[in-house]
Amino acid sequence: MPNKVYDVTIIGGGPIGLFSAFYSGLRSMKTKIIDAEPAVGGKVRYFFPEKIIRDIGGIPAITGENLVANLKQQAETFHPTIVCSERVVDVTKLSDGTFQLTSHNGSIHFSKTIVIATGSGTFEVNKLEALHAEDFPFAIHYDVKNIEQFRDKVVVVSGGGNSAIDWAQTLEPIAKQVHLIYRGEDFKAHEESVRELQNSRVEIHIHHEINELIGTNNQLTKINVCCNKTQATKTIQTDALFINHGVKVDLGTMAEWGFEQADFGIVVDDEMKTTVPGIFACGDSATYPRKIRIIAAGLHEGPIAINSAKKYLEPTAADEAMISTHHESFIG
């Protein structure tokens, strides 16, 4: 077993997990990433490949796809082992203190420490299952790989959170017309995003819900929407419909792993330690007072978790890694 034991195993290969792997390399830790999805990148890869991300210092704007590509390239600097399509379902601490991680397919992994960076958990988008949505499989979208397919099209976006507003704004300069349908009034999104939306060409329909999809031969041509305050209806011509109604989050068996959890994640202290010695958490997996849930904050928490894991293994180790500009791997 010794040659199979890693210093740290990072569960979750999203942006925070990838950057944590890079930082663990700076700390000379033998590192493994295990991700439940077929490829690393997390929700950013799945939901935001062509969306513009603006909440990372020093990067005014970057697509999700490019951000993930950069983070993956950076993570591979120190050659971590990356395992995809495996969902960790059980963690057991052995008599020698090593953790045994069991995946859903029966694979076994061994690690001296664990960093949980699974975000909110594994996820599945909430799909539109009524209104005969199955009749329009190519016109109803939950994520987009190629935004150019909507150039000069009329597009409807349904939802009122950050994702819906981001998509409406991303599509606005590409599409002929963008409509945003929201059943509420106060958008659940960043204030500046809402302000930009209100100053854009996007036609906003608050207090409205979709009540009928109309088209032929699997081609959506229009939707009917109803005002939930007045019951008045109207018809909107459209070529495509985006559904942004949130996701179903599955924390799987984590609740059985022994650490304290709260409503918004795994409880950690200021060193990203969970209540189980040797297990740490960061990013959207973790919660603590005054938590800020943006990518930039998670990129800060990941190195804290790795430093804590390093100190757990070697109490006399330095508190933090030498800055990368002075690291031997980047000199010469």
From Swiss-Prot:
Residues bound to FAD? D35, K43, F48, V88, F123, D284, T325
Keyword annotations for this protein, in alphabetical order, are: FAD, Flavoprotein, NADP, Oxidoreductase
Q: What Pfam families does UniProt report for this protein, alphabetically?
A: Pyr_redox_2 (PF07992)
Enzyme Commission code(s) on record: 1.18.1.2
The disulfide bridges present are: none
Q: Which InterPro entries match?
A: FAD/NAD-bd_sf, FAD/NAD-binding_dom, Fd--NADP_Rdtase_type_2, Ferredoxin-NADP_redctase_2
One function term, GO molecular function aspect: NADP binding
Q: Cofactor(s) for this protein?
A: FAD
Q: How is the cofactor bound?
A: Binds 1 FAD per subunit.
Tell me its family.
Belongs to the ferredoxin--NADP reductase type 2 family.
Please describe the quaternary structure of this protein. Homodimer.
Q: Which PANTHER family match?
A: THIOREDOXIN REDUCTASE 1-RELATED-RELATED (PTHR48105)
Q: What is this protein called?
A: Ferredoxin--NADP reductase 1
Q: Which organism is it from?
A: Listeria monocytogenes serotype 4b (strain F2365)
